[in-house]
Design a protein with these regions (language model features):
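Short, solvent-exposed loop/linker segments at beta-strand-coil boundaries, enriched for Pro/Gly
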Residues: 44-56
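Intrinsically disordered, low-complexity regulatory regions in eukaryotic proteins
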Residues: 1-27, 31-37, 53, 57-60, ...
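Short, basic/aromatic beta-hairpin or loop at an interaction surface
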Residues: 37-45
Length: 151
């Protein structure tokens, strides 16, 4: 992150646990790094595949918000579990009393002369599929790890 960035996002990659016929989500934390009110908008290369809530918002100075990106249930696995989808998070400074519903239509339009910062986020699918017969063993191992780490 450079000091001049209006907002920072974590994680910097959207990671979805991919299962056929199941919806899954990833939360992004958006942090306003300035003393200004900052408006944001989320765009994606695959709008039919994802729900983004909120997809537009205003973050108060030094505050943060959570954006939930939901991957819709898919009918087939992508080739090699690779995902070429991308997200773009645009941000710009707005006046202090701006409400998300009051944002002008051209807020995120560079041609209007607005100064827009853009942050690109990649998408990664994590396979939840496991070889036959090993899923129970994996589940007991991972729950065992959780038990031992919580003491």
């Amino acid at each position: 992150m450079t000091a001049s960035q209006l907002i920072s996002v974590s994680p910097d990659e959207l990671r979805f646990h991919f299962e056929l016929e199941k919806q899954t989500f990833c939360d992004l934390k958006v942090l306003n790094n300035t003393q200004n009110h900052v408006a944001f908008k989320v765009k994606t290369t695959s709008p039919k595949k994802y729900f983004v809530r909120p997809n537009t918002g205003v973050v108060h100075p030094w505050d943060s918000c959570i954006i939930r990106v939901t991957l819709q249930a898919q009918r087939e696995y992508p080739p090699d579990m690779q995902c070429k989808d991308k997200f773009l998070l645009q941000s710009t400074i707005v006046s202090p009393n701006t409400d998300v519903d009051d944002l002008p239509a051209d807020t995120f339009n560079k041609e209007s002369g607005n100064s827009i910062e853009e942050l690109k986020l990649r998408v990664a699918y994590i396979s939840t599929a496991s070889p036959e017969g090993s899923s129970e063993d994996d589940a007991s191992r991972s729950s065992h790890k959780l038990d031992s780490s919580s003491h």
